[in-house]
């Protein structure tokens, strides 16, 4: 485990994190971008530029910076990128305009990387999870109307366990058996992410 602050809102911080990871572990085989901050629950007309920037810089820009910085090492290892997006973007959830915009930007960035980096043996995929976390509980308490409008019990009858039902999918996506899967979005929402 590398003991670093992995904030992704500026190039210098990202370069330092990547350098420390390479110095500690000898390279990079897998990049997972899942950090995100936002002002979810605020309707679009009430969103401020600062709230919008928070979502874009902590999510979309962070993924962009980390992907660029890790690319040489991922190319060397024929590695994998797993980016986290959200049903908020897929389904246009109420009160989540900045978060949805950042997450859909990440999906677009991921598809471009899958196209451009495939020749280098790098596969790039996206996961849209729905897990019961402390952040989801905080969202429920802070924005009960937006929570009620957006978050329903999945058909599977429970929210995902982050470690066993989402983390293990990430592990599998990084394995050689799944190397040919690239440019895809997997919706891990217990049946809520049904799409044509």
Task: Please report, for each region that a protein language model flagged, where it lies by residue.
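Short C-terminal tail/terminal secondary-structure segment
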Residues: 41, 91, 170, 182-196
